[in-house]
Amino acid sequence: MATFESSLKPKLIYVFRINDAAHSGALKIGEATAELGDGYFTPNSPLLKQAAHQRIDQYTKTAGISYQLLYTEGTMFKDAKGCISSFNDKQVHLVLERSGVKKKDFGKKNQGTEWFMTDLPTVKRAIVAVQEGRQPPIGREISPKQETIVFRP
């Protein structure tokens, strides 16, 4: 009897930093695949951390770059209607950008596009905003700066 193996693998979001001058104040928000599990993970579970380390090591280990993994979270969740949903790192990036969080400028075109000048609590709030289906900008939750509204006649 033939067996079926799904090609769909659970995804996760990871956040890490590199403690050097070039990356000062910046966090990388990326996405990886978890090879095990059903997709429902608690944030920072050992399985998520392992998958994140495997992914990050792919592009840091050979260069001898040390990093600090700060946070991991599975991308599958139940939405407000109880339906299974998923999100990706690009959606988190969009919330951050539209909320006024700046990307890290490394001085080269198309380099470091997933690095943001932010802190971990802000990234976590952006993830929640994506899960709740809130459209950016999410204002005061992300940035303490309040823009003036100009009404047109």
Model-flagged regions — what are they?
Residues 1-153:
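Non-catalytic accessory segments flanking enzymatic or RNA/DNA-binding domains
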